[in-house]
Every structure is written in C-alpha cells, then in structure tokens.
A protein has these predicted regions:
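Non-catalytic terminal accessory/regulatory regions of metabolic enzymes
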Residues: 1-79
Length: 79
C-alpha cells in the first residue's frame, strides 16, 4: 500500500522559498500567481495486510517522531 504524506510549513510561518518562487515567476511575466508555498511530498510503502487503524497509528507515529517538525510544519495524508 503506497502512502503519500504532504508536509508544509504552517500558515503563519514565513516561507522564503515560496517568496523566491513567486518573485521569479513574476519576473518571467507570470504575475497571476501569488501566495506560493512550497512543501515536500513523502512516499512510503506499508504492507497491504495492515489494518486501517494500525496504518493510521504507524503513519502518525512516524510523522511525529521523524518526518514532521510539528512546531513549524503540518502534514496531510493524501489518498
């Protein structure tokens, strides 16, 4: 079972990478884009025979212990 986890900075955290992307797009003539935020996508596999509850528990534990800095980041499990 393929799991995708989207990690991004919390909304109130200044995001310089997104700002640089926005400025670069503007300089290339793409002035319609604004409020750009950049994140990371983590993909991992879990066995198919794992229960939904155990899957959720393992994902949450991995995110809290290693994958996400919950002080400045938030995450969303996709799909």
């Amino acid at each position: 079972m393929r799991i995708k986890i989207l990690v991004r900075l919390k909304g109130q955290i200044l995001e310089p990478q997104g700002k640089v992307i926005e400025q670069s797009l503007n300089s290339l003539g793409f002035t319609e884009f604004s409020n750009i935020r950049q994140g990371k996508l983590i993909e991992l596999d879990l066995p198919d025979n794992i229960s939904k509850e155990e899957k959720s528990q393992k994902i949450e534990s991995a995110c809290k212990k290693l994958l996400v800095n919950d002080i400045i980041e938030e995450y969303e499990v996709l799909g």
